[in-house]
Amino acid sequence: MRLHDTLHAAKRVFSPKNSERVGVYVCGPTVYDLAHIGNARSVVVYDVLFRLLKALYPEVIYVRNITDVDDKIINATESENKSIAELTAHYTKLFHEDIEALNCLSPTFEPRATEEIETMLHIIGRLIQAGHAYVRGGTVYFSVESYKHYGALSGRKLGDMISGSRVEVVAEKLHPGDFVLWKPATDLDMKLGACWPSPWGVGRPGWHVECSAMSYRYLGDSFDIHGGGADLMFPHHENEISQSCCAFPGSEYARYWVHNGFLTVNGGEKMSKSLGNVITVRGLLSNGVDGEVIRYVFLSTHYRKPLDWGDKAVLDAKEALNKIYRSCEGFSAQLLSTGLEDVGVHDAVMASLRDDMNTPAAIAALHELVKEINKTNNAGEKLRLARVLNKSAMLMGMFRNFPERKLLDMRGLVDEGEINRLIEKRVEAKKCGDFKLADEIRESLSNMGIGISDGKDGSTRWHRKN
Protein backbone atom coordinates (compact mmCIF):
# COMPACT_ATOMS: atom_id res chain seq x y z
CA MET A 1 0.00 0.00 0.00
CA ARG A 2 1.16 3.53 -0.75
CA LEU A 3 0.11 6.71 1.05
CA HIS A 4 0.90 10.34 0.32
CA ASP A 5 2.97 11.55 3.25
CA THR A 6 2.70 15.31 3.76
CA LEU A 7 5.99 15.47 5.65
CA HIS A 8 7.89 14.01 2.67
CA ALA A 9 5.55 15.58 0.06
CA ALA A 10 5.40 12.28 -1.81
CA LYS A 11 3.68 8.92 -2.00
CA ARG A 12 5.50 6.39 0.14
CA VAL A 13 5.18 2.64 0.50
CA PHE A 14 3.43 2.07 3.80
CA SER A 15 5.67 0.16 6.19
CA PRO A 16 4.26 0.03 9.74
CA LYS A 17 6.44 -0.18 12.84
CA ASN A 18 4.82 -3.51 13.62
CA SER A 19 3.15 -5.43 10.80
CA GLU A 20 0.96 -7.19 13.37
CA ARG A 21 -0.45 -3.98 14.87
CA VAL A 22 -0.99 -0.69 13.02
CA GLY A 23 -1.59 2.52 14.98
CA VAL A 24 -3.63 5.43 13.57
CA TYR A 25 -4.53 8.75 15.20
CA VAL A 26 -6.98 11.21 13.64
CA CYS A 27 -8.06 14.60 14.98
CA GLY A 28 -11.74 14.38 15.84
CA PRO A 29 -14.49 16.96 16.40
CA THR A 30 -14.69 19.89 18.78
CA VAL A 31 -18.16 19.29 20.14
CA TYR A 32 -19.84 22.68 20.42
CA ASP A 33 -22.09 22.59 17.33
CA LEU A 34 -23.51 20.27 14.67
CA ALA A 35 -21.08 18.50 12.37
CA HIS A 36 -20.90 20.11 8.92
CA ILE A 37 -19.99 18.33 5.69
CA GLY A 38 -16.36 19.44 5.96
CA ASN A 39 -16.11 17.59 9.29
CA ALA A 40 -17.93 14.63 7.79
CA ARG A 41 -15.64 14.36 4.78
CA SER A 42 -12.66 13.88 7.06
CA VAL A 43 -14.47 11.21 9.09
CA VAL A 44 -15.43 9.28 5.93
CA VAL A 45 -11.90 9.50 4.48
CA TYR A 46 -10.31 7.97 7.56
CA ASP A 47 -13.12 5.44 7.88
CA VAL A 48 -12.08 4.12 4.45
CA LEU A 49 -8.45 4.04 5.59
CA PHE A 50 -9.46 2.15 8.75
CA ARG A 51 -11.43 -0.40 6.71
CA LEU A 52 -8.58 -0.86 4.24
CA LEU A 53 -5.98 -1.34 6.97
CA LYS A 54 -8.25 -3.85 8.73
CA ALA A 55 -8.39 -5.83 5.47
CA LEU A 56 -4.59 -5.82 5.17
CA TYR A 57 -3.29 -6.18 8.75
CA PRO A 58 -4.16 -8.43 11.72
CA GLU A 59 -4.86 -5.57 14.16
CA VAL A 60 -5.51 -1.87 13.70
CA ILE A 61 -5.76 0.57 16.61
CA TYR A 62 -7.69 3.62 15.42
CA VAL A 63 -7.84 6.55 17.83
CA ARG A 64 -10.06 9.56 17.09
CA ASN A 65 -10.35 12.11 19.86
CA ILE A 66 -13.15 14.31 21.12
CA THR A 67 -12.12 17.87 22.01
CA ASP A 68 -14.47 18.72 24.86
CA VAL A 69 -12.79 21.82 26.29
CA ASP A 70 -11.63 24.92 24.40
CA ASP A 71 -12.58 28.55 23.84
CA LYS A 72 -15.43 27.76 21.41
CA ILE A 73 -16.98 25.28 23.82
CA ILE A 74 -16.72 27.70 26.72
CA ASN A 75 -18.33 30.49 24.68
CA ALA A 76 -21.11 28.19 23.47
CA THR A 77 -21.73 26.97 27.01
CA GLU A 78 -22.12 30.54 28.22
CA SER A 79 -24.46 31.54 25.37
CA GLU A 80 -26.64 28.41 25.63
CA ASN A 81 -26.75 28.55 29.44
CA LYS A 82 -25.68 24.93 29.83
CA SER A 83 -22.90 23.20 31.69
CA ILE A 84 -19.88 22.12 29.67
CA ALA A 85 -20.74 18.48 30.38
CA GLU A 86 -24.31 18.96 29.10
CA LEU A 87 -23.25 20.82 25.96
CA THR A 88 -20.45 18.45 24.96
CA ALA A 89 -22.49 15.32 25.75
CA HIS A 90 -25.33 16.66 23.58
CA TYR A 91 -23.18 17.46 20.54
CA THR A 92 -21.12 14.29 20.92
CA LYS A 93 -24.35 12.27 20.75
CA LEU A 94 -25.48 14.14 17.62
CA PHE A 95 -22.06 13.70 16.02
CA HIS A 96 -22.24 9.94 16.58
CA GLU A 97 -25.74 9.79 15.11
CA ASP A 98 -24.67 11.75 12.03
CA ILE A 99 -21.62 9.66 11.21
CA GLU A 100 -23.57 6.47 11.89
CA ALA A 101 -25.92 7.60 9.11
CA LEU A 102 -22.83 7.80 6.86
CA ASN A 103 -21.97 4.20 7.82
CA CYS A 104 -18.71 5.05 9.58
CA LEU A 105 -17.20 2.48 11.92
CA SER A 106 -16.53 3.40 15.52
CA PRO A 107 -12.83 3.99 16.27
CA THR A 108 -11.01 1.58 18.56
CA PHE A 109 -10.67 4.36 21.14
CA GLU A 110 -12.37 7.75 21.32
CA PRO A 111 -10.73 9.63 24.22
CA ARG A 112 -12.04 12.93 25.49
CA ALA A 113 -9.53 15.68 26.17
CA THR A 114 -10.84 16.28 29.70
CA GLU A 115 -10.10 12.65 30.60
CA GLU A 116 -6.40 12.98 29.76
CA ILE A 117 -5.34 16.06 31.77
CA GLU A 118 -2.78 14.05 33.76
CA THR A 119 -1.11 12.88 30.55
CA MET A 120 -0.96 16.48 29.33
CA LEU A 121 0.64 17.63 32.59
CA HIS A 122 3.20 14.83 32.25
CA ILE A 123 4.18 15.95 28.73
CA ILE A 124 4.34 19.63 29.69
CA GLY A 125 6.53 18.79 32.68
CA ARG A 126 8.95 16.87 30.45
CA LEU A 127 9.14 19.80 28.02
CA ILE A 128 9.95 22.29 30.80
CA GLN A 129 12.56 19.96 32.27
CA ALA A 130 14.22 19.53 28.86
CA GLY A 131 14.31 23.28 28.21
CA HIS A 132 11.74 23.25 25.40
CA ALA A 133 9.08 25.12 27.40
CA TYR A 134 9.02 27.98 29.88
CA VAL A 135 6.59 29.58 32.35
CA ARG A 136 5.45 33.20 32.30
CA GLY A 137 2.84 34.30 34.83
CA GLY A 138 1.13 30.93 35.05
CA THR A 139 1.19 30.37 31.29
CA VAL A 140 3.44 27.66 29.89
CA TYR A 141 4.78 28.28 26.37
CA PHE A 142 6.56 25.95 23.98
CA SER A 143 9.75 27.47 22.57
CA VAL A 144 9.63 26.99 18.80
CA GLU A 145 13.28 28.00 18.43
CA SER A 146 14.25 25.04 20.60
CA TYR A 147 13.14 22.58 17.91
CA LYS A 148 15.32 22.81 14.83
CA HIS A 149 12.80 21.05 12.57
CA TYR A 150 9.91 23.42 13.33
CA GLY A 151 8.07 24.16 10.07
CA ALA A 152 9.10 20.96 8.27
CA LEU A 153 5.55 19.60 7.95
CA SER A 154 3.94 22.75 6.55
CA GLY A 155 7.03 23.78 4.59
CA ARG A 156 7.26 27.15 6.34
CA LYS A 157 10.21 29.06 7.68
CA LEU A 158 10.00 30.32 11.23
CA GLY A 159 10.54 33.92 10.17
CA ASP A 160 7.69 33.75 7.66
CA MET A 161 5.29 32.44 10.29
CA ILE A 162 5.66 35.47 12.53
CA SER A 163 3.67 37.64 10.15
CA GLY A 164 0.99 34.97 9.71
CA SER A 165 -2.50 35.77 10.90
CA ARG A 166 -2.61 32.73 13.19
CA VAL A 167 0.46 33.73 15.21
CA GLU A 168 -0.50 35.55 18.40
CA VAL A 169 2.01 38.24 19.36
CA VAL A 170 2.34 38.44 23.16
CA ALA A 171 5.04 40.49 24.90
CA GLU A 172 5.90 37.81 27.45
CA LYS A 173 6.79 35.25 24.78
CA LEU A 174 10.45 34.66 23.99
CA HIS A 175 9.50 34.34 20.32
CA PRO A 176 6.25 35.45 18.62
CA GLY A 177 5.72 31.91 17.31
CA ASP A 178 5.78 30.28 20.75
CA PHE A 179 2.47 28.62 21.55
CA VAL A 180 0.52 27.86 24.71
CA LEU A 181 0.78 24.51 26.46
CA TRP A 182 -1.07 25.59 29.62
CA LYS A 183 -3.01 28.76 30.37
CA PRO A 184 -4.27 30.24 33.66
CA ALA A 185 -7.97 29.90 34.35
CA THR A 186 -10.16 32.93 33.72
CA ASP A 187 -13.11 33.82 35.92
CA LEU A 188 -15.40 32.22 33.33
CA ASP A 189 -13.28 29.06 33.29
CA MET A 190 -13.58 28.88 37.07
CA LYS A 191 -17.33 29.48 36.95
CA LEU A 192 -17.85 26.70 34.39
CA GLY A 193 -15.39 24.27 35.93
CA ALA A 194 -13.16 24.32 32.86
CA CYS A 195 -9.91 24.25 34.84
CA TRP A 196 -7.63 21.87 36.70
CA PRO A 197 -4.81 22.17 39.24
CA SER A 198 -1.25 22.03 37.92
CA PRO A 199 2.29 22.80 39.14
CA TRP A 200 1.95 26.17 37.37
CA GLY A 201 -1.41 27.12 38.81
CA VAL A 202 -5.05 26.36 38.14
CA GLY A 203 -5.76 26.46 34.41
CA ARG A 204 -6.48 24.42 31.31
CA PRO A 205 -4.45 22.96 28.44
CA GLY A 206 -3.71 24.52 25.10
CA TRP A 207 -5.32 22.83 22.11
CA HIS A 208 -2.17 21.36 20.57
CA VAL A 209 -0.96 19.43 23.60
CA GLU A 210 -4.33 17.68 23.88
CA CYS A 211 -3.75 15.58 20.76
CA SER A 212 -0.14 14.84 21.67
CA ALA A 213 -1.33 13.54 25.03
CA MET A 214 -4.17 11.42 23.68
CA SER A 215 -2.07 9.84 20.92
CA TYR A 216 0.68 9.08 23.47
CA ARG A 217 -1.81 7.58 25.91
CA TYR A 218 -3.20 5.07 23.42
CA LEU A 219 -0.45 4.61 20.81
CA GLY A 220 2.80 5.48 22.57
CA ASP A 221 5.40 8.10 21.66
CA SER A 222 5.64 6.87 18.06
CA PHE A 223 2.98 5.37 15.82
CA ASP A 224 2.21 4.81 12.15
CA ILE A 225 -0.32 7.27 10.71
CA HIS A 226 -1.60 10.68 11.80
CA GLY A 227 -4.57 12.00 9.83
CA GLY A 228 -6.65 15.14 9.68
CA GLY A 229 -7.87 17.94 7.46
CA ALA A 230 -5.44 20.09 5.49
CA ASP A 231 -6.60 23.08 7.55
CA LEU A 232 -4.98 21.48 10.62
CA MET A 233 -1.53 21.16 9.07
CA PHE A 234 -0.46 24.52 10.48
CA PRO A 235 -0.32 25.36 13.26
CA HIS A 236 -1.97 22.37 14.95
CA HIS A 237 -0.08 19.44 13.45
CA GLU A 238 3.17 21.39 13.20
CA ASN A 239 2.95 22.08 16.92
CA GLU A 240 2.02 18.49 17.73
CA ILE A 241 5.16 17.17 16.05
CA SER A 242 7.35 19.71 17.80
CA GLN A 243 6.14 19.15 21.33
CA SER A 244 5.93 15.35 20.99
CA CYS A 245 9.39 14.92 19.49
CA CYS A 246 10.87 17.24 22.13
CA ALA A 247 9.05 15.54 25.01
CA PHE A 248 10.23 12.12 23.86
CA PRO A 249 13.71 12.45 22.31
CA GLY A 250 14.37 9.93 19.57
CA SER A 251 10.67 9.60 18.76
CA GLU A 252 9.50 10.35 15.23
CA TYR A 253 5.94 10.80 16.53
CA ALA A 254 3.94 9.84 13.40
CA ARG A 255 5.68 7.97 10.58
CA TYR A 256 3.13 9.07 7.95
CA TRP A 257 1.11 12.29 7.84
CA VAL A 258 -2.11 12.11 5.80
CA HIS A 259 -4.26 15.17 5.08
CA ASN A 260 -7.60 15.37 3.30
CA GLY A 261 -8.40 18.38 1.10
CA PHE A 262 -10.66 21.34 1.67
CA LEU A 263 -14.41 21.30 1.05
CA THR A 264 -16.25 24.26 -0.47
CA VAL A 265 -19.86 24.87 -1.48
CA ASN A 266 -21.72 26.55 -4.33
CA GLY A 267 -18.84 26.78 -6.77
CA GLY A 268 -15.93 27.42 -4.44
CA GLU A 269 -17.31 29.31 -1.43
CA LYS A 270 -15.74 28.56 1.92
CA MET A 271 -18.41 27.57 4.44
CA SER A 272 -18.98 30.31 6.98
CA LYS A 273 -21.70 31.18 9.47
CA SER A 274 -21.39 34.81 8.40
CA LEU A 275 -22.20 33.81 4.80
CA GLY A 276 -25.03 31.58 5.95
CA ASN A 277 -23.82 28.72 3.76
CA VAL A 278 -22.86 26.11 6.36
CA ILE A 279 -24.28 22.72 5.38
CA THR A 280 -24.65 20.25 8.23
CA VAL A 281 -24.94 16.50 7.91
CA ARG A 282 -28.11 16.62 9.98
CA GLY A 283 -29.62 19.22 7.67
CA LEU A 284 -28.96 17.09 4.59
CA LEU A 285 -30.41 13.99 6.23
CA SER A 286 -33.48 15.95 7.34
CA ASN A 287 -33.98 17.12 3.75
CA GLY A 288 -34.05 13.56 2.46
CA VAL A 289 -30.46 13.19 1.24
CA ASP A 290 -29.53 9.61 2.08
CA GLY A 291 -26.35 9.00 4.06
CA GLU A 292 -25.08 6.72 1.30
CA VAL A 293 -25.46 9.55 -1.21
CA ILE A 294 -23.43 11.87 1.03
CA ARG A 295 -20.73 9.23 1.39
CA TYR A 296 -20.68 8.58 -2.38
CA VAL A 297 -20.18 12.30 -3.08
CA PHE A 298 -17.18 12.37 -0.75
CA LEU A 299 -15.61 9.26 -2.27
CA SER A 300 -16.14 10.42 -5.86
CA THR A 301 -13.30 12.93 -5.38
CA HIS A 302 -9.81 11.88 -4.33
CA TYR A 303 -9.36 12.63 -0.65
CA ARG A 304 -6.42 15.00 -1.20
CA LYS A 305 -8.23 17.12 -3.79
CA PRO A 306 -10.61 20.00 -3.05
CA LEU A 307 -14.28 19.00 -3.15
CA ASP A 308 -17.06 21.42 -4.06
CA TRP A 309 -20.47 20.44 -2.70
CA GLY A 310 -23.52 21.31 -4.77
CA ASP A 311 -26.83 20.01 -6.06
CA LYS A 312 -25.22 18.54 -9.16
CA ALA A 313 -22.83 16.44 -7.07
CA VAL A 314 -25.80 15.05 -5.14
CA LEU A 315 -27.76 14.35 -8.33
CA ASP A 316 -24.78 12.62 -9.92
CA ALA A 317 -24.35 10.45 -6.84
CA LYS A 318 -28.02 9.45 -6.85
CA GLU A 319 -27.86 8.52 -10.53
CA ALA A 320 -24.68 6.51 -10.11
CA LEU A 321 -26.03 4.63 -7.10
CA ASN A 322 -29.28 3.98 -8.93
CA LYS A 323 -27.38 2.25 -11.76
CA ILE A 324 -25.55 0.07 -9.27
CA TYR A 325 -28.69 -0.85 -7.32
CA ARG A 326 -30.59 -1.73 -10.50
CA SER A 327 -27.88 -4.18 -11.57
CA CYS A 328 -28.69 -6.34 -8.55
CA GLU A 329 -32.42 -5.81 -8.21
CA GLY A 330 -33.12 -9.50 -8.89
CA PHE A 331 -31.26 -10.59 -5.76
CA SER A 332 -32.25 -10.34 -2.12
CA ALA A 333 -29.92 -8.80 0.42
CA GLN A 334 -29.62 -12.20 2.10
CA LEU A 335 -28.61 -13.88 -1.15
CA LEU A 336 -26.00 -11.23 -1.90
CA SER A 337 -24.56 -11.46 1.60
CA THR A 338 -24.32 -15.25 1.58
CA GLY A 339 -21.08 -16.83 0.43
CA LEU A 340 -19.04 -13.63 0.54
CA GLU A 341 -16.15 -15.62 2.00
CA ASP A 342 -15.99 -17.48 -1.33
CA VAL A 343 -15.40 -14.33 -3.36
CA GLY A 344 -12.73 -11.68 -3.10
CA VAL A 345 -12.67 -7.94 -3.43
CA HIS A 346 -12.42 -6.97 -7.09
CA ASP A 347 -8.72 -6.68 -8.02
CA ALA A 348 -9.11 -3.22 -9.55
CA VAL A 349 -10.95 -1.93 -6.47
CA MET A 350 -8.28 -3.19 -4.09
CA ALA A 351 -5.44 -1.94 -6.31
CA SER A 352 -7.03 1.52 -6.45
CA LEU A 353 -7.50 1.74 -2.69
CA ARG A 354 -3.96 0.54 -2.03
CA ASP A 355 -2.73 3.36 -4.27
CA ASP A 356 -3.19 6.26 -1.85
CA MET A 357 -6.88 5.52 -1.30
CA ASN A 358 -7.88 6.33 -4.87
CA THR A 359 -11.62 6.03 -4.26
CA PRO A 360 -12.67 7.59 -7.61
CA ALA A 361 -10.77 4.83 -9.43
CA ALA A 362 -12.26 2.23 -7.09
CA ILE A 363 -15.76 3.53 -7.81
CA ALA A 364 -15.03 3.40 -11.55
CA ALA A 365 -14.06 -0.25 -11.09
CA LEU A 366 -17.41 -0.88 -9.36
CA HIS A 367 -19.22 0.51 -12.39
CA GLU A 368 -17.21 -1.78 -14.68
CA LEU A 369 -18.48 -4.66 -12.56
CA VAL A 370 -22.02 -3.34 -13.03
CA LYS A 371 -21.54 -3.50 -16.80
CA GLU A 372 -20.41 -7.12 -16.53
CA ILE A 373 -23.42 -7.99 -14.36
CA ASN A 374 -25.81 -6.39 -16.82
CA LYS A 375 -24.14 -8.06 -19.79
CA THR A 376 -24.14 -11.69 -18.65
CA ASN A 377 -27.16 -13.94 -19.12
CA ASN A 378 -25.75 -16.67 -16.89
CA ALA A 379 -27.66 -16.53 -13.59
CA GLY A 380 -24.86 -18.14 -11.58
CA GLU A 381 -22.22 -15.80 -12.97
CA LYS A 382 -24.49 -12.80 -12.43
CA LEU A 383 -24.88 -13.75 -8.75
CA ARG A 384 -21.12 -14.30 -8.34
CA LEU A 385 -20.34 -10.90 -9.85
CA ALA A 386 -23.03 -9.26 -7.71
CA ARG A 387 -21.43 -10.74 -4.60
CA VAL A 388 -18.02 -9.43 -5.69
CA LEU A 389 -19.65 -6.03 -6.20
CA ASN A 390 -21.18 -6.16 -2.74
CA LYS A 391 -17.95 -7.22 -1.02
CA SER A 392 -15.92 -4.62 -2.91
CA ALA A 393 -18.33 -1.82 -2.04
CA MET A 394 -18.38 -2.88 1.61
CA LEU A 395 -14.62 -2.24 1.76
CA MET A 396 -15.45 1.42 1.12
CA GLY A 397 -18.32 1.40 3.60
CA MET A 398 -21.01 1.42 0.94
CA PHE A 399 -24.22 -0.57 0.37
CA ARG A 400 -25.13 -1.04 4.04
CA ASN A 401 -28.76 -1.89 3.20
CA PHE A 402 -28.01 -3.30 -0.23
CA PRO A 403 -30.09 -3.87 -2.24
CA GLU A 404 -33.78 -4.02 -1.33
CA ARG A 405 -34.58 -0.78 0.50
CA LYS A 406 -32.37 1.31 -1.73
CA LEU A 407 -33.91 -0.07 -4.88
CA LEU A 408 -37.38 0.83 -3.68
CA ASP A 409 -36.23 4.32 -2.75
CA MET A 410 -34.66 4.90 -6.13
CA ARG A 411 -37.31 3.21 -8.27
CA GLY A 412 -40.28 5.43 -7.75
CA LEU A 413 -40.91 5.94 -4.05
CA VAL A 414 -39.24 9.33 -4.36
CA ASP A 415 -40.48 11.92 -1.90
CA GLU A 416 -42.73 14.54 -3.54
CA GLY A 417 -40.91 17.31 -1.72
CA GLU A 418 -37.65 16.20 -3.32
CA ILE A 419 -39.31 16.07 -6.76
CA ASN A 420 -40.72 19.57 -6.38
CA ARG A 421 -37.40 20.89 -5.11
CA LEU A 422 -35.59 19.53 -8.16
CA ILE A 423 -38.22 20.93 -10.50
CA GLU A 424 -37.89 24.37 -8.88
CA LYS A 425 -34.14 24.09 -9.26
CA ARG A 426 -34.60 23.24 -12.95
CA VAL A 427 -36.95 26.19 -13.50
CA GLU A 428 -34.42 28.50 -11.86
CA ALA A 429 -31.62 27.06 -14.00
CA LYS A 430 -33.60 27.72 -17.18
CA LYS A 431 -34.31 31.29 -16.10
CA CYS A 432 -30.57 31.81 -15.60
CA GLY A 433 -29.78 30.28 -18.97
CA ASP A 434 -28.08 27.23 -17.45
CA PHE A 435 -29.70 24.75 -19.83
CA LYS A 436 -27.01 22.14 -19.21
CA LEU A 437 -28.00 21.91 -15.53
CA ALA A 438 -31.69 21.91 -16.49
CA ASP A 439 -31.11 18.93 -18.79
CA GLU A 440 -29.11 17.13 -16.11
CA ILE A 441 -31.95 17.56 -13.62
CA ARG A 442 -34.46 16.25 -16.19
CA GLU A 443 -32.27 13.18 -16.74
CA SER A 444 -31.87 12.65 -12.99
CA LEU A 445 -35.62 12.78 -12.48
CA SER A 446 -36.06 10.34 -15.35
CA ASN A 447 -33.64 7.91 -13.71
CA MET A 448 -35.71 8.17 -10.54
CA GLY A 449 -38.79 7.17 -12.51
CA ILE A 450 -40.18 10.69 -12.83
CA GLY A 451 -41.26 12.18 -16.17
CA ILE A 452 -41.77 15.92 -16.65
CA SER A 453 -43.46 18.07 -19.28
CA ASP A 454 -43.13 21.82 -19.77
CA GLY A 455 -46.25 23.84 -20.55
CA LYS A 456 -46.36 26.84 -22.89
CA ASP A 457 -47.19 29.03 -19.89
CA GLY A 458 -43.86 28.14 -18.27
CA SER A 459 -45.31 25.62 -15.83
CA THR A 460 -43.84 22.17 -15.33
CA ARG A 461 -45.85 19.04 -14.59
CA TRP A 462 -44.50 15.72 -13.42
CA HIS A 463 -45.73 12.14 -13.32
CA ARG A 464 -44.45 8.79 -12.18
CA LYS A 465 -43.48 6.48 -15.02
CA ASN A 466 -45.00 3.02 -15.18
Curated annotation (Swiss-Prot):
One of its GO terms (cellular component) is cytosol. Its cofactor is Zn(2+). Zn(2+) binds at C27, C211, H236, E240. Transmembrane segments: none annotated. CDD domains: CysRS_core. GO terms for molecular function: ATP binding; cysteine-tRNA ligase activity; zinc ion binding. ATP binds at K273. Keywords: Aminoacyl-tRNA synthetase, ATP-binding, Cytoplasm, Ligase, Metal-binding, Nucleotide-binding, Protein biosynthesis, Zinc. The keyword Cytoplasm applies. Its EC number is 6.1.1.16. It catalyses: tRNA(Cys) + L-cysteine + ATP = L-cysteinyl-tRNA(Cys) + AMP + diphosphate. Its main location: cytoplasm. Monomer. PANTHER family: CYSTEINE--TRNA LIGASE, CYTOPLASMIC, CYSTEINYL-TRNA SYNTHETASE. This is Cysteine--tRNA ligase. It comes from Anaplasma marginale (strain St. Maries). The lineage of its organism: Bacteria, Pseudomonadati, Pseudomonadota, Alphaproteobacteria, Rickettsiales. The gene is cysS.
